[in-house]
């Protein structure tokens, strides 16, 4: 991937809709570039599969099953986060 040329070590990336498709591909590419990931999807099972791939790149990965159309779930998630350097808004 082209992101291998970019050093994202010590950066945290949040990817919504990361359980499948484009979101999953973005999360993996960011992990290849050295970023730590926070991945969100509605289904924990999908997140677990993606997290396993991300961990092969020695990146930390936090998963959060969340429906981004649910205000309460999103608010609870936001209150737990301290630092996000990169946002990929892919859900929906």
Task: Give the residues covered by each predicted segment.
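Structural signature of beta-strand start/N-cap positions in the alpha/beta core
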Residues: 12, 36, 60-62, 83-85
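Aromatic pocket-lining residues of Rossmann-like dinucleotide-binding sites
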Residues: 30
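The beta1-alpha1 cofactor-binding region of Rossmann-like NAD(H)/NADP(H)-dependent oxidoreductases
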Residues: 45, 64-76
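Flexible N-terminal pre-Rossmann segment of NAD(P)-dependent oxidoreductases
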Residues: 1-11
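Conserved glycine-rich Rossmann-like NAD(P)H-binding loop of the short-chain dehydrogenase/reductase
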Residues: 35-49
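Rossmann-fold scaffold of SDR-type NAD(P)-dependent oxidoreductases
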Residues: 16, 84-92
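Conserved glycine-rich cofactor-binding loop
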Residues: 12, 17-21
């Amino acid at each position: 991937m082209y992101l291998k040329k970019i050093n994202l070590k010590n950066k945290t990336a949040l990817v919504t809709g990361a359980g499948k498709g484009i979101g999953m591909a973005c999360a993996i590419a960011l992990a290849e570039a050295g970023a730590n990931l926070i991945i969100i999807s509605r289904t924990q099972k999908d997140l677990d599969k993606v997290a396993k791939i991300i961990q092969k790149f020695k990146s930390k990965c936090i998963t959060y099953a969340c429906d981004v159309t649910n205000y309460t779930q999103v608010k609870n998630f936001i209150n737990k986060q301290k630092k996000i350097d990169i946002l990929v808004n892919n859900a929906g």
